[in-house]
């Protein structure tokens, strides 16, 4: 099996790649080749099969055709400009998140010869906009309030239509906000959800730009990888024509996050959080969904690695900090 990962240098892309390289299999099939793409070269990888490293912008004309020329069996489309950056740079957001996605799907469509890969597309809960019900189900209509959400919503429609026409076997998964993200902060407007936990655990002070009553939907990197692997191997006939699914997660307020941090790591760690409201971030967060009913995804076999927000913090300490944090 040949696997292509677009956006392989990003956090979720790296985690997915590490898991695939470690397992050497996807479902019941041995991996025989992997292609890892990003705008910057993903890290070189050692494996018992060829691993091609490709650096380049997949939204440049002709680039996607090169990526699918060898007909990968599974395509993980993780490449995207994140929410805050897409809002600040309108042209860049649409070029990457919309035009790039269309170019990739068209490259697959035009490959011909009966080529029909499984395409796993990472969408976002940002496709939904206020006003919200208490818990948002898959049937809730798309009214995104950000450019990023609009781009992802259009990507969902394209994926469903190209699948309906028989050009690919697509599954779109709406990821919760991933928490706790390892590494340095990125330009995602949601980054503070991870920052206020990751930085204090590393002994650093951090700014909280919103109020503690802000509620949001979260899942760990470990769960995100599990979602992607299940989407790539599940029986897609059970999904039917509604090809995009909201992934399960945990709904929690910022205050509940901080309370969990205190329980797991102590008051001294939580005291490193400094409250400094940011009107730009607050304006974006006001239009975000807060809670979901992921019943359909659960019925189709998607599961999370965490059951409580304490678990989210413990998983980060275990996976990223070697089991230790700065008290």
Question: Residues of each region from the PLM?
Answer:
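NAD(P)H-binding glycine-rich loop region in Rossmannoid oxidoreductase-like domains
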Residues: 58-96
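Conserved Rossmann-fold NAD(P)-dependent oxidoreductase catalytic core, especially the SDR/UDP-sugar
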Residues: 102-146
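NAD(P)-dependent short-chain dehydrogenase/reductase
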Residues: 160-215, 221-226
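Mid/C-terminal beta-alpha module of Rossmann-like enzyme folds, strongest
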Residues: 200, 223-282, 325-327
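Amphipathic terminal alpha-helices
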Residues: 277, 289-295, 299, 303-327
